[in-house]
Amino acid sequence: MTTKQVHNFGNNVRFTPAMYAEPADEAGLLKLLEDHNDLSIRVIASGHAWSDAIKTDGLLINVKHFNEVRISPQGDSVYVGAGCQIKCLAAALAEQGKSLPTSGLIDEQTVAGATATGTHGSGKNSLSQYVRSVRVVHFDKETGTPKVSTITGPSVELSAARCSLGLLGVIVEVEMEIRPAYNILEYSARYQTLDQVVALEHEYPLQQFYLMPWSWHWFGQHRKETTQARSKLAGLYRVYWHVGIDWGLHLVIFALVKLMRVKSLIRFFFKRVLPLVVAKNWRVVDSSQKMLTMEHEIFRHIEIEVFVRRSDLKNALEEVKQTIQVFGGEAVSSDLQQQIPKSDHGTYQHHYPICIRRVLADETLVSMTSPSNEKDIQDWYAISLICFEWPSCRHGFFGFANFLASHMATRFHARSHWGKYNPLDRQANQQLYPRLDEFRSVVQKFDPESRFANEWLSNVILSDADRVA
C-alpha cells in the first residue's frame, strides 16, 4: 500500500488519494476494506476515462490482479476477473473459438471499468447489457463488515449492477455472455447527406459513420457479420489502418493542432486532403475483434460523447454542426448563434471527425442507452467529439463541451457518457434517467453509508440524503 499522485489517460483528472492499494486476491481485498473502513473508497481500472468517477481522497483500489478468465461449462458465458483488460479477454476467448457479442472502439479498458460505465460499440447493445452476474465486495448493511455478494437476474439489482459506476462496491468478477467467434465484412464510402448513410443501416447493421468537420461530408464505415473467410489482403488492410489511420492521420492532426496551430490549415486538411487519402470501397473480411477496434490510446486526447434517440438524430447532428461552426468563429442563421455566449464565439476549432454509432437500448437503469420511455424504446446514437489539444490549452474545448452537453440535454434529452467528459448535474440527470430513483434504492441497499461514492458522483447522480459530505 502506498500514496501516490494518480492521473487518467487524458491528464484532465489528477488527485492524490490517502492510500493506494493493489490487493492480490479476494481475501486480501476483504482485509483491506476491514482495516480501512473509515475511508471513502473508489476503484481505478485502466484510467481510460475522462470523468471524475475515479477521484477520491480516501482509499483507491486497483484490481489488476483479478484477471482470471474461465468459460462456463455450458460455453455460453465467461467468468472474468474485474481487472482483466478487454484485449486479454478477447485473446483468451479467441483461443477457444469464442467472442464477446460486441466490442468498444478500444480494448485497453478493463472488464469492470467498461461495463460499469456503459462502454459500447456500434449496432448492438452496450457491453453492460451482456452482463449476467456480478460478484461484488461491499459492507454488510447490518454488521458493517466487508462481505461478498453475487448479483444475478433477472432482477432490478442486476439491472443496476450492469452499469453501476462503482457505487455498489468493489467488483471482483463479472459473468458475461459470449458467442462463437465471427468475422466482419467492412468497406468505407463518402456521402453528401446523412440520409444516404443511414439508408445502408439495414444492410450493414454494425456500421459507424463520421461527420467530417468543415467539409461537412459524411464518411460511412459499413460493417456486417459474415460467414465469408478472412480476406487474403486482410493483413495489408490492417497495416494500412494501423499506419495510415492509427498513426498517420493522428500525427497529422497532432502537428496541425499542437504545433502549427493555424485554423485555416485544419480546415484545408478536412476539405481538400483527407478525402483523397482515405481508402474507399475496399471490401475486406477479418475477425470481429480486429475490425471493431482501433488504437485510440496512442495519442493523448479528451472526449465528450452525447447520446440521442433515433427520432432526434438528424436535428441533433445539425445543431452539433452549428455549434462547431459558432465556436469556430463562423456565423449561422439559426437561433443557436444567439444562444451561445458571444465570449465563446471563435474560441474552439474542432479538428477531428465526429463519430456516430448506433447502440440498441439496454436493460439497465442508468447506462446512457437505457430506455428513456418504456412505451417508446428507440435505438440510441452516440455522437463522439474528440479534442487533441495540449491539456493546458483545453479551455476552448471545455467551453464548447459544457455548452453542447447542456444544450443537447435540454433540446433532445441527450445523455452524456459517464466515462467521458460529463458536465451534466444531478438536476439534468434526474430528467434524463427515468429509473434513477430505482438505481439509488439499489445503491442504498449495497452501500447505505455512501462509502463507495465520491463528490462528483454525489453531485451528479445520488440524492441529497445519499450525498458524500
Where are the regions that the model predicts?
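Noncatalytic alpha-helical scaffold of FAD-dependent oxidoreductases
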Residues: M1-A469
